């Protein structure tokens, strides 16, 4: 039994083991600030502190003065079960914070909580309000800006004044009458020089339509002249006249038809070609020539004259 009791006494932790040593320093880098078992954190009111102080003090010590003014002060932070050195350090830290808070100027009015739980703002002193108002008034004062004088006031000769006093006020009825009179005068204007465009003629006969025609070329005009000449020759011979080709090597063969070289119809007279008079009466030779120039040596005379221009070389194939 004695051995068992001795073992139990050795296993029980003592108060010195639970308290941290004074040499251990506190730092901001400590992440785990867990307190050992048995340590209680309490917030002591000033009344409780005074009661504890009276209990700790002896009967011979004089009583402490009443602390009625400390009721509104901030309740100090106190840890029970810690060493005296740690308690002094904590008190010194919080005292420094409180002194720094007192020295800092109040930039904004702080709200306080009344007894019924509603927030109330402190009333600003009335002495500061007129001073700020006067400072703003004095700060805004400056040289007044003079507005420029208008030009029509300083130089009235440059401006012309118009007045509508002599003009009668127009009504809606007068405007309507003026518009109708203008439209009636426009409708009475004759449209003699008006030519309706395509598909704008109101009549059913289609007068004034635009007819599109193909432009006439020079070759078509010459062909038309050929037909007119044929009709004239036929009517002079009694309707049975024949058209013969004149000799291509004649003097009329070298005549060219303008600058474009189109073929032309040439009707030689009997005085120029006496040999053509041997034919039937009313027969006229018609010569055709192209735009390409040909040599006379390659052509043979119609009547087979050996003294012709092509008799020396013989007939051309």
Curated annotation (Swiss-Prot):
Q: Tell me the segments the record calls region Disordered.
A: 1-74, 101-152, 216-317
Q: Name one GO molecular function term.
A: protein-containing complex binding
Which residue intervals make up region (Interaction with SNRNP200)?
Answer: 146-300
Where in or outside the cell? Nucleus; Cytoplasm
Keyword Phosphoprotein attributed: yes
Q: In which tissues is it expressed?
A: Expressed in placenta. Widely expressed in embryo and newborn.
Give the compositionally biased regions (Acidic residues).
1-19
Which positions carry Phosphoserine? 57, 64, 83, 92
Q: Which residues carry this modification: N6-acetyllysine?
A: 214
Composition bias, Low complexity: 20-37, 240-250
According to the UniProt record, where is the region Hom2?
Answer: 74-101
Superkingdom, taxonomy of origin = Eukaryota
Hom4, as annotated region: 198-238
Query: Which keywords fit this entry according to its UniProt record?
Result: Acetylation, Cytoplasm, mRNA processing, mRNA splicing, Nucleus, Phosphoprotein, Spliceosome
Q: Which residues carry this modification: Phosphothreonine?
A: 124
BP GO terms, sorted: spliceosomal snRNP assembly; spliceosomal tri-snRNP complex assembly
Pfam families reported in the protein's UniProt record? TSSC4
Quaternary structure annotation from Swiss-Prot or TrEMBL: Interacts in a RNA-independent manner with distinct U5 snRNP-containing complexes, the mono-U5 snRNP and the post-splicing U5 snRNP-PRPF19 complex. Interacts with SNRNP200; the interaction is direct, excludes recruitment of C9ORF78 and WBP4 to SNRNP200 and negatively regulates its RNA helicase activity. Interacts with PRPF8; the interaction is direct.
* The protein's name: U5 small nuclear ribonucleoprotein TSSC4
Organism, per UniProt? Answer: Mus musculus (Mouse)
Recite the lineage of the species.
Eukaryota, Metazoa, Chordata, Craniata, Vertebrata
């Amino acid at each position: 039994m004695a051995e068992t009791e001795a073992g139990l006494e050795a296993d029980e932790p003592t108060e010195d083991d639970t308290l941290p040593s004074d040499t251990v320093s506190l730092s901001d880098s400590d992440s785990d600030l867990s307190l050992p078992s048995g340590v209680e954190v309490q917030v002591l009111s000033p009344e409780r502190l005074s009661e504890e102080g009276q209990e700790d003090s002896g009967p011979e010590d004089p009583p402490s003065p009443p602390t009625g003014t400390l009721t509104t002060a901030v309740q100090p932070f106190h840890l029970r079960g810690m060493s005296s050195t740690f308690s002094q350090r904590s008190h010194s830290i919080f005292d420094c914070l409180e002194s720094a808070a007192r020295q800092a100027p109040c930039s904004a009015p702080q709200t306080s909580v009344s007894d019924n739980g509603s927030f109330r703002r402190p009333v600003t002193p009335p002495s500061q309000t007129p001073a700020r108002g006067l400072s703003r008034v004095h700060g805004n004062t400056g040289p007044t800006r003079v507005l420029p004088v208008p030009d029509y006031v300083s130089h009235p000769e440059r401006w012309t004044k118009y007045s509508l006093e002599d003009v009668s006020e127009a009504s809606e009825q007068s405007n309507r009458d003026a518009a109708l009179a203008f439209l009636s005068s426009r409708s009475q204007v004759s449209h003699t020089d008006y030519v309706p465009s395509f598909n704008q003629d109101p009549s059913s006969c289609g007068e004034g339509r635009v007819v599109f025609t193909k432009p006439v070329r020079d070759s078509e005009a010459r062909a038309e002249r050929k037909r007119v000449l044929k009709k004239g020759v036929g009517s002079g011979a009694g309707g049975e006249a024949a058209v013969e080709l004149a000799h291509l090597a004649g003097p009329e063969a070298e005549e060219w038809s303008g600058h474009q070289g189109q073929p032309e119809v040439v009707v030689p007279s009997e005085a120029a070609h006496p040999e053509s008079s041997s034919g039937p009466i009313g027969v006229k030779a018609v010569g055709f020539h192209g735009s390409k120039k040909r040599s006379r040596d390659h052509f043979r005379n119609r009547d087979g004259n050996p003294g012709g221009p092509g008799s020396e070389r013989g007939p051309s194939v």
